[in-house]
Amino acid sequence: MKTKPFLLQLAALVVVAAIFYASYGATNTLASARANVPEIYFAWERALPFWAWSIVPYWSLNLLYALGFFLCKGARELARYVTQLLVAQMIATLFFIAFPLQMSWEKPAVSGFSGFLFSSLAAFDLPFNQAPSLHVILCVVVGAFYLRKARAVWLKAALAAWFALIGLSVLTTYQHHFIDIPTGLAAGCFVLLVRPMDGAPLSFAIVREAARYKWAALYLGLAFLTLFAAILGAKIWNSWALWLSWVSLSFALVACGYAFLGARVFAKNERGKHAAAAKALLFPYLCVARLNASFWLRGRRLADEILPGLYLGSVKEAGKFDAVLDCAAEFERPGGAQIYASLPMLDMITPGADELRHGADELERLVKTTLGGGENLLQSVAKLGSNFSAEANGYANERNLKFHRQAGSRANLQTRGTANEGEKQTLANSNEQAAEVNDKKVLVCCALGYGRSASVLLAWLVIYGGLGFDEALDLLKSRREKIAVASSLRERITRLAAEARVNSKAE
């Protein structure tokens, strides 16, 4: 028998509300039993006004919280909403137990409807459970739920303004100190990152690779260093130094990405955009990544043509191309490219076999759809007059014959490793001929265009073109300087090419 949606939603509300009040009350009771509960606030907070009317938006979160259960469309959305609320409750509860704080300021006497709401709040609340503010955490989570539901721009703006007022009200009702707000915002964004309403939840993926743990250790060290600087700076200089803890948090999340979360920690979607929660949490790191890319690319070409119409370079140049294969997890998609494929990878580590295979497949798709099947690419390199092994040529021929049957003619791909000056001139001439036929351009990119994107382009040249690994690598190095690929890449790409040949023969 099918359960009616309303009954399921009501049951979920009752269970989650029971967990909320039970855990919230328990942590309040634990804190009240302590002999000394610290209080953290800044001197300027004494100048904050008390607005009795702001208890209305403060209380409205309770109504919006409950109403959300009945706005869920289907069991899946309800399950996601419930999970987000429970994760939010769990995070807050752990902090309330581990780091209890209090708000000791006495509220002015209030009468009327606002007085009734303050009295109702005092009936079950105590001046503990401060940082991170659970009210602010839920403001982020519930606010994101409603903003996702809203379609009209004016409604989104109105909702955003109201939830911002709810967040502000924790100060103007003397319920919280300022430090509870940024910690609550961070916790709320973390909830949305690990359990998003759309897409797969953030999950662990342990990869036994020394380079990953080396970079994880480096970023974890930076996280501790900046946290220490934040605390020390606040003690001996100014409380504003505490904002360095935001930098610390972003580095810690990146460390988790290298250790066990992978590129998913950036929450970059198929449109090349980071989720708002990831962008907020990782903002300091994202700024550092952009500065780092600008430093290493100063005075250098942002992209180089490898084959006619096919370029390798930095994501900073992506807006100038017709099609883009983006391998940079830490950069968002720039505007301009009409055809876009996102394959987020972490920087400074060798792409895995699955990433290389997926990247080669995506690049093949872009070449076919953008460059008219890629015939000009292959013809231009064939004119270099190079020779490959019989096995490589045989596989290339098989692939070309298959494409002839599917979408028209396609030439054999033949090249030699390091091109001399005569070969470069031949390629230049063929490039001019290709431009007359097709002036569209495809870019394979990452932050700098030296590592991740080069690895994917290598995989495509070997898997789909039939080149040997050394020949493909020499071709890239002759076209773009500073190419940096790990030695382990040879084995991975060679194995993928062998598997592709077996599958091709089987078909």
Where are these regions (language model features)?
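N-terminal transmembrane-helix/juxtamembrane module of multi-pass inner/ER membrane proteins
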Residues: 1-64, 108-109, 118, 262-274
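Aromatic-anchored segments of alpha-helical transmembrane domains
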Residues: 21-22, 89-95, 161-171, 225-231
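Membrane-interface loops
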Residues: 28-46, 71-166, 190-194, 202, ...
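Membrane-embedded alpha-helical segments of multi-pass membrane proteins
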Residues: 56-64, 133-141, 182-186
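Cysteine-based protein phosphatase catalytic domain of the PTP/DSP
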Residues: 114-121, 295-372, 435-444, 459-501
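Interfacial helix-loop-helix junctions of multi-pass membrane proteins
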Residues: 130, 165-191
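PTP/DSP superfamily signal
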Residues: 199-294, 364-372, 437-441, 452-507
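Intrinsic disorder/low-complexity segments
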Residues: 368-438
